């Protein structure tokens, strides 16, 4: 179940303040945030936001296609090591 429309999208207050300040001055700086749950709003388009994935900050450039999604969707938290090689498995079974 999603968030109620009457409440509006959740955006971290401090993150929103930083975005608005950069929009007023016209600066383009990378903004570090730990708020993965914040929704991307039209004011953020064109900015680069470094989203924390539990280990480091991943820079995410915000485009119009991302509006309505959460910041955390663009900074994966898990590493995929890959599936085991089938040839290696067969060789182990024969020995």
Swiss-Prot record:
Region feature Disordered, mapped onto this chain: 76-95
Biological processes, Gene Ontology terms: ribosomal small subunit assembly; translation
GO MF, one annotated term: rRNA binding
Composition skew (Basic and acidic residues), residue ranges: 82-95
Record key words, sorted: Ribonucleoprotein, Ribosomal protein, RNA-binding, rRNA-binding
Keyword Transcription belongs to the record: no
Record GO cellular component, one term: small ribosomal subunit
Function statement: Protein S19 forms a complex with S13 that binds strongly to the 16S ribosomal RNA.
PANTHER family the record matches: RIBOSOMAL PROTEIN S19P FAMILY MEMBER (PTHR11880), SMALL RIBOSOMAL SUBUNIT PROTEIN US19M (PTHR11880:SF8)
Protein name: Small ribosomal subunit protein uS19
